Regions:
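Conserved small/polar residues in nucleotide/adenosyl-binding loops
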Residues: 1-6, 360-367
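Short acidic-hydrophobic sequence patches enriched in Asp/Glu that either
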Residues: 168, 302, 337
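Short, Lys/Arg-enriched charge-dense amphipathic segments
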Residues: 19-25, 82-83, 165-172, 181-185, ...
Length: 370
């Protein structure tokens, strides 16, 4: 979707009712006002769109205009604000002929360098290089690959003092993990900031003795490569597959008794995997299965989490029921399992609404680990 005013414009990707403003395409537009009214012209290349290779195309589309001073929004195809999926109420444009989807293939190589001064005022320089690849497998599925990525220019997190027993989850700012990830986050169990960032102390704390401390905690873990395939087929089945590999990272440990130092591995070679199957159903309903897994080399623990989430609406979309089930396991010397499940229901349309009324059951691991 795109929005424009006289001097500004933006584009976003819509997933259900969520607008992802980090979505960025190449397109052009022009806005004008004359005695006949307000006009907007858009020029969007076919490479920015996904459509099948058929002789006659039928597309969904909608147009809207917002008038802020009246708090008014007018749409070409009427939209019911009580329904959750804006896209399902798009208008139809039929009979588009003689267009061919272009090859969707992009290579984006990069080189970067960093210069810093050490404690002895010595100039230290580092160089990095890698590549991003995007390939349209077909009109439904897209492959994204990043090789030796450099996220040094990504916005830093704000400093937060955490005095609670729970971890603070920060927003994801790395472009590879924000584009086309709607399916991966739908079940709420995939937290991409685990990949390629500072290692949790619970991963390496059993290697440090009481009279020792880390000399330095690296702020990130080298990400060797990551890839994802995502899209939705004609039958409404959404597919998402993700894989990421991070390198081994070591640091020094200081012995507070004799001032000696030794080297330990704080982050082993790790492989992260995510699989998502998301099926659209009638009445704006859906069912989603997600599985996340991390494998770590050596004696470090591995983990697996699976989730099933479904939402069922009545034909009128007045009433709904949600259900989700999550099962997790931590594998080291022995397997520890945990699970949670819950449901909620309510009336979401009409002059009288209620809910959601919910219930949640949780059984945690005997040994809690990140």
């Amino acid at each position: 979707g795109s929005e424009m005013c006289i001097r500004d414009r933006l584009d976003a990707k819509i997933f259900n009712q969520d607008f992802n403003n980090l979505f960025n395409l190449v397109w052009n537009s022009k806005v004008s006002i004359n005695e006949k009214g307000w006009f907007a012209e858009l020029k969007i290349p076919y490479s920015a769109l996904r459509f099948p290779k058929t002789k006659i195309q039928n597309w969904n589309i909608n147009f809207a205009r917002q008038i802020s001073r009246f708090r008014e929004e007018s749409t070409w195809q009427p939209v019911n604000p009580d329904l959750e999926n804006y896209l399902l109420e798009s208008g139809k444009v039929n009979g588009i002929e003689n267009i061919t989807p272009p090859l969707r293939l992009a290579f984006i190589p990069f080189l970067s360098s960093y210069y810093s001064f050490s404690k002895n005022d010595d100039l230290v320089s580092t160089y990095n290089g890698g590549m991003d690849i995007k390939y349209g497998i077909n009109e439904a599925l897209t492959l994204d690959v990043t090789l030796l990525p450099d996220f040094g220019q990504v916005v830093f997190d704000k400093q937060v003092l955490n005095i609670s027993p729970f971890e603070i989850q920060f927003n994801e700012n790395r472009q590879f993990f924000t584009e086309g990830t709607e399916l991966f986050t739908k079940s709420g169990i995939f937290y991409s900031r685990r990949i390629g960032v500072q290692t949790s102390p619970k991963v390496y704390q059993n290697q440090i003795q009481e009279n020792e401390e880390l000399v330095e905690i690296p702020s990130s873990v080298p990400l060797l490569n990551a890839s994802k395939i995502s899209g939705r087929l004609k039958n409404g089945l959404g597919i998402g597959v993700f894989n990421g590999i991070t390198a081994e990272q070591q640091t020094e440990v200081l012995n507070l008794t004799d001032s000696s130092e030794r080297t330990i591995t704080i982050s082993p070679l790790s492989n992260y995997n995510v699989l998502v199957l998301d099926q659209n159903l009638k009445n704006n309903s859906f069912v989603t299965f997600t599985n996340t897994n991390v494998w770590r080399a050596g004696l470090f623990y591995d983990a697996n989490v699976s989730a099933i989430k479904t939402k069922l609406n009545t034909p009128s979309n007045d009433y709904f029921i949600d259900f989700d089930l999550k099962v997790s396991s931590i594998i080291n010397s022995e397997a520890n399992f945990g699970h949670s499940w819950g449901f909620e229901t309510g009336k979401q349309r009409g002059n009288f609404t209620f809910g959601p009324v919910s219930y949640t059951h949780l059984r945690a691991h005997e040994t809690t680990l990140d």
